[in-house]
């Protein structure tokens, strides 16, 4: 029994190794549940009981899978990595939803799975109408799911699997990583994972310290730090960040949302004092330029429509909204819907684009937009000068035709999924603008609320079928669509 699914010479999917690693992931998830359990005990809340029960069950099942599914063949191929990446996020959400079902403010199975998937994918959409009624333990668990999902479940687990072959680690890394290029930041993926999570943790601790200097308690500082650096957007208050009425808090969150939207490869370069390389990066400069461009347009709309109410209304408030939307964080600091139809239209576009690849953000990624713009310029130049010898380069690296085709295919499927989600909600009787905004939010892992979702971004109005569809769209968006879609191809399952 110990060497279940051991087929060293087989070309079939290595189910034994997949279950072995999945068992380790479940043990990691069980360990994370200790934090909200401790929080419940500190605040004298009864929700420590479901956390203790669920953590124990998750640990036992994970340990059993890790022990019995321990194959001789430890090689992971590309198909294995893609399957494991998809299954891991679903399994994490299935066990992660149990605290929401067994707590003092229970959700049904549709709502609980939606909430867990929204957390782990850092979407930030919620079905909880009044989060302030939840226990501190549940609020901590919501925030923690986003912190875990920020860099990725697979990436975190790779820090604890030293025995996994490097090619297998690379397959898992690519299956979960985002963008048109995947940089290996270290010789071994396990070392890369430790480096990234170490940096992620340091930034989180720094953010907690800075938030504690403002008008916000330690518990809320920890929760918002988890959901800010992960660009997730869950809050401990129904009105979100607006409840604090603090320019300082908004400024700190803008700074770290911006950092969360930057490729961690660039952050490591900055850490190593390679600032010149950071500034020369095409995508980083376009990221800055995009924020500046949208800031000018949003401020112009605010002034034109007479919504100027003081210096905050034309400085930190529009900047907060832009960075929140572009980085797919989804924090709300006020009623931005009142700024006019232009701002709503720009918000759609910002949600679509997203920030940099290799960051914690959702969306199509600025990297792809940079490639499309450069490719468009190249095509126009070739049309004028047919014999022109040139290539499409991003950050000094040539993007070959195969990568270009992948970008085009991704944009097409990404847009199709948004349309599909919008049509599903329209068919269920929701207004067309609200339906497509909600679909945008889920596919781009954004979570911003507007229209029927309101400032709280609550999706409790959705019927059960709508919640399951939106949950699937969140997962597709987090795994950059292609990884999930390939599982439905018959050729994927052939040896």
Language model: regions and residue ranges:
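Membrane-proximal intracellular helices of multi-pass ion channels
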Residues: 1-495
